[in-house]
Structure formats: structure tokens, C-alpha cells
From Swiss-Prot:
It catalyses: ATP + H2O + 4 H(+)(in) = ADP + phosphate + 5 H(+)(out). PANTHER family: ATP SYNTHASE, ATP SYNTHASE SUBUNIT BETA, MITOCHONDRIAL. Keywords: ATP synthesis, ATP-binding, CF(1), Chloroplast, Hydrogen ion transport, Ion transport, Membrane, Nucleotide-binding, Plastid, Thylakoid, Translocase, Transport. It is found in: Plastid, Chloroplast thylakoid membrane. Disulfide bonds: none annotated. NCBIfam families: atpD. Produces ATP from ADP in the presence of a proton gradient across the membrane. The catalytic sites are hosted primarily by the beta subunits. One of its GO terms (biological process) is proton motive force-driven mitochondrial ATP synthesis. This is ATP synthase subunit beta, chloroplastic. GO terms for cellular component: chloroplast thylakoid membrane; mitochondrion; proton-transporting ATP synthase complex. GO terms for molecular function: ATP binding; ATP hydrolysis activity; proton-transporting ATP synthase activity, rotational mechanism. PROSITE patterns: ATPASE_ALPHA_BETA. The gene is atpB. Transmembrane segments: none annotated.
Length: 495
């Protein structure tokens, strides 16, 4: 971490005092630069090309050194378009890796991979910056306690609990509620844990990034009137950007999150959407650098690159970074090297189901497909584990009976199976819940449900104590007391 004397970035004059080289070759987003003998920059150093193109337009391109080629030449990858660059242009070695602004000044703002604001709200306080390349915390700094990260979302906390400082894979297609779930998690961590969030948009659509920003402003996660009260910082490296930017934007977001964890000692949520695009960008850069491709055309350094990002996401004695990563699975092939390498790092998976979304059950988290390594009696306790297993068994039996119901109808089932179906339908509805960030759209107030309340509610449904209540009473409520109150209201309306 570096504390700069002024609030502005390094000026051109101070940069020009440093080491100077010249462009020898340009291959798309890759530059070869010649430096004087004995003045070679280090790997990962940031290089800056400043000047004017043939029509007099200002050029300012930042690159990152990737290879030392010999004969005083280095190969660097550009973080922005290389249009207008020519051979012989001056290149300044900054003498350090890319550094980005960190701290409270980043909240409510949108940054690019270089840590420059791109939201038209003026400059950001850059007195405190941090390099994007850092080693993972040492073993002695790690917090090895296995503790659950309570989200206040019933289906997640009960059936696929998140680990504090863990990594969660979020699987879901378009239109099943990924964005709303992400925003609710950002909102809940701010309210319940006093934490902040960092969102890294890696190689996804610019339109989606814009939609997310607008929805965050609408729901209050980003407070336009008082930016400092916002709960999230956004870092975007979208699909239209060069592979260098898409490969490094995840590290920029992670660096901002690390500051909140290590210096502010907060619990941080780090969202990466999409981790597959990080691998994809690495694959493009690898080919541009002339490395031999590995399995399915991916880079030979796939595991190393993934590990260097994932190992920095962890709990230390100061605070925690809990990461939720959207995972795109190419051609639905889970054995593809990119998702397969990602799975090795995940502690839990949250799978969103189009079938549940079609039924109007939100959050549309699939209770049978979502998994967590935390769901063990020694970690969550016997009561939680037993309740979760019984909920899953009931839902699984309901799933098995659905074909019979579709062909023969409910009446052909045994008494026991009919009871199972009735309870499963109540459970399915009770797994839905109104979200704070959806209040503006639905008009119903959001609910945060603590874990003990969640367990109690499902125990009451499973025990049969609530068999007499209509299943509609369990739909979009918070805790079980609200469901019983809703049932009484429904009764009153009938009379």
C-alpha cells in the first residue's frame, strides 16, 4: 500500500524522469519495447505510452510487462486499445506494478482496470493506492475457524450455507434473478455485518453492467445523494475491452476488497461476474504471448492464474473476504478445464432454477442442486443439519412423485405420500422470501430472517404442526410467525 502526497495521479513530468524505452513491434494488444542495456523493467511493471497519433490525437496507453525476451526487449500487454500507436514511440517504465485507489473513496463509484473513475462524478481521492499484484496472506495470518456467514436468506442459510471467508459459485442463466440475489446479499451484509462489497464485472456485457448500476441506485445500495454512504464499489472490464484489461480487472476489484479487510478490518463481499471470462482473457493473452496451448486450447498456466486470484480471497485475523463468483459453464460441460479448475476452489454452490422462477418462487435457488461443504453436523450443529436433511428428503420425495401426480392425480397417492406432498409444497413456498432491494418493484417490505428463526420455521412444517394452514400462507413471508398471521388473515377474508 502506498500513501501519495497529493490527491491526483502521477503527473507526466514525474513519470518522464524514469526509465525510457521505445516501441519495437506492435501485435494487436501486445507491444515489444526496447530499453537501454541494464535498465530493463521487472515483470508486472506498468509501462505508459504517451504521445500523439498521426492525426494529433492524445494517446495514453498503460501496459503491463509479461515477458523479458532478451536483447534488451520486453513484451507487454496493453490495458486499453492500441489504436494509433507506432514503432519508435517513447515508453515510460513507472518502476512499479499497476496501483489502484483503495478505501472509502471507492464506494459508490465505477472504476476501470487502472482504477480510473468512469462514472462522470469527477476524480477520486488517490492518496492511498495499492498495487494489484500481491502475495496471498501467510499461513500465520489466516483465520482457520469454520464459521457460517449468515445472509438472512432462508434457502441459502439452511440448505447451502456460505462459509465466512469462503468462495461460492453462483450458477444461473439469464432472467432467473442473479442480479437481484447479488444486490440483496450486498444490502444484507451492509446492514447485518457492517460490511461493504466490491463488484468485479469481468468480461460481461456493458449493458448488464449499466443495468446493475441503475438498479443499485434505485434500490439504495448506491446512494447518489451521499456517495460516501454507498455500500459497494464497482470495477468493470467489459467484453469490448482488450484481453489484458479483462485479465486484470478481477485483481483490481480484489485489491480494493483486501484494503477493507486488512486495514478497515471489515467483512467484505467480493462479487466476480464472470470468473470464466477471467480464464478466457488469460487464454487470449497466453496465445498472444506465444505460449503453447494446453488442454482444449486453454493456457498452460490456467491452474496457477486461478490459484493466484483465489488464494488471496480468504479470512484473516483482521476480517474476511467472502467471494461469490458467477460461473459460466461453456456448452453445459462441467468437465471443461475452466469450470473444473474453478470448482476445486469453491466451498459452496448456489444454483438458480428456471423452473422455480417460472413458478414465481424467488429467490429461485434450487434447494436440491445447491451444495455446501459447511453443511456438516460438527460445523452447523446437529439441529441445523437434521432439519436441512429432512427438508431435502421431503423435497426429493415430492420430485419423485410429480410424474405420478401428473398422470394419475393426487388422489391415487397413499395417505403418507399425500402428506409429504402437502408439506413439500409448503416448504417450497416458505423457501421464498421478500427482498429489501425488490421493495421498489413489489411494494412488499423485505425480510431478513436469522438462522435460528429459519430452522424453527422448517421444524414446525416438518413436524406437522402447521398441516392445517393453506400453502398460500407460506409464500413470500419472512419467519414462520408471519406465515401463521397470514393464514389467519386469509381465513378472515374468506369469512
Amino acid at each position: 500500500m502506498r500513501i501519495n502526497p497529493t490527491t491526483s495521479g502521477p503527473a507526466v513530468s514525474t513519470l518522464e524522469e524514469k526509465n525510457l524505452g521505445r516501441i519495437a513491434q506492435i501485435i494487436g494488444p501486445v507491444l515489444d519495447v526496447v530499453f537501454p542495456p541494464g535498465k530493463m523493467p521487472n515483470i508486472y511493471n506498468a509501462l505508459v505510452v504517451k504521445g500523439h497519433d498521426t492525426v494529433g490525437q492524445q494517446i495514453n496507453v498503460t501496459c503491463e510487462v509479461q515477458q523479458l525476451l532478451g536483447n534488451n526487449r520486453v513484451r507487454a500487454v496493453a490495458m486499453s486499445a492500441t489504436d494509433g500507436l507506432t514503432r519508435g514511440m517513447k515508453v515510460i517504465d513507472t518502476g512499479a506494478p499497476l496501483s489502484v485507489p483503495v478505501g472509502g473513496a471507492t464506494l459508490g463509484r465505477i472504476f476501470n482496470v487502472l482504477g480510473e473513475p468512469v462514472d462522470n462524478f469527477g476524480p477520486v481521492d488517490t492518496r492511498i493506492t495499492s498495487p494489484i499484484h500481491r502475495s496471498a496472506p501467510a499461513f500465520i495470518q489466516l483465520d482457520t475457524k469454520l464459521s457460517i456467514f449468515e445472509t438472512g436468506i432462508k434457502v441459502v442459510d439452511l440448505l447451502a450455507p456460505y462459509r465466512r471467508g469462503g468462495k461460492i459459485g453462483l450458477f444461473g442463466g439469464a432472467g432467473v434473478g442473479k442480479t437481484v440475489l447479488i444486490m440483496e446479499l450486498i444490502n444484507n451484509i451492509a446492514k447485518a455485518h457492517g460490511g461493504v462489497s466490491v463488484f468485479g464485472g469481468v468480461g460481461e456485457r456493458t449493458r448488464e453492467g449499466n443495468d446493475l448500476y441503475m438498479e443499485m441506485k434505485e434500490s439504495g445500495v448506491i446512494n447518489e445523494k451521499n456517495i460516501a454512504e454507498s455500500k459497494v464499489a464497482l470495477v468493470y472490464g467489459q467484453m469490448n475491452e482488450p484481453p489484458g484489461a479483462r485479465m486484470r480487472v478481477g485483481l483490481t476489484a480484489l485489491t480494493m476488497a483486501e484494503y477493507f479487510r486488512d486495514v478497515n478490518e471489515q467483512d467484505v463481499l467480493l462479487f466476480i461476474d464472470n470468473i470464466f471470462r477471467f480464464v478466457q482473457a488469460g487464454s487470449e493473452v497466453s496465445a498472444l504471448l506465444g505460449r503453447m496451448p494446453s488442454a482444449v486450447g486453454y493456457q498452460p498456466t490456467l491452474s496457477t492464474e486461478m490459484g493466484s486470484l483465489q488464494e488471496r480471497i480468504t479470512s484473516t485475523k483482521e476480517g474476511s473476504i467472502t467471494s461469490i463468483q458467477a460461473v459460466y459453464v461453456p456448452a453445459d460441460d462441467l468437465t471443461d478445464p475452466a469450470p473444473a479448475t474453478t470448482f476445486a476452489h469453491l466451498d459452496a454452490t448456489t444454483v438458480l432454477s428456471r423452473g422455480l422462477a417460472a413458478k414465481g418462487i424467488y429467490p429461485a435457488v434450487d434447494p436440491l442442486d445447491s451444495t455446501s461443504t459447511m453443511l456438516q453436523p460438527r460445523i452447523v450443529g446437529e439441529e441445523h443439519y437434521e432439519t436441512a436433511q429432512r427438508v431435502k428428503q421431503t423435497l426429493q420425495r415430492y420430485k419423485e412423485l410429480q410424474d405420478i401426480i401428473a398422470i394419475l392425480g393426487l388422489d391415487e397417492l397413499s395417505e403418507e405420500d399425500r402428506l409429504t406432498v402437502a408439506r413439500a409444497r409448503k416448504i417450497e413456498r416458505f423457501l421464498s422470501q421478500p427482498f429489501f432491494v425488490a421493495e421498489v418493484f413489489t411494494g412488499s417490505p423485505g425480510k431478513y430472517v436469522g438462522l435460528p428463526e429459519t430452522i424453527r420455521g422448517f421444524q414446525l412444517i416438518l413436524s406437522g404442526e402447521l398441516d392445517g394452514l393453506p400453502e398460500q400462507a407460506f409464500y413470500l413471508v419472512g419467519n414462520i410467525d408471519e406465515a401463521t398471521a397470514k393464514a389467519m388473515n386469509l381465513e378472515g377474508e374468506k369469512k
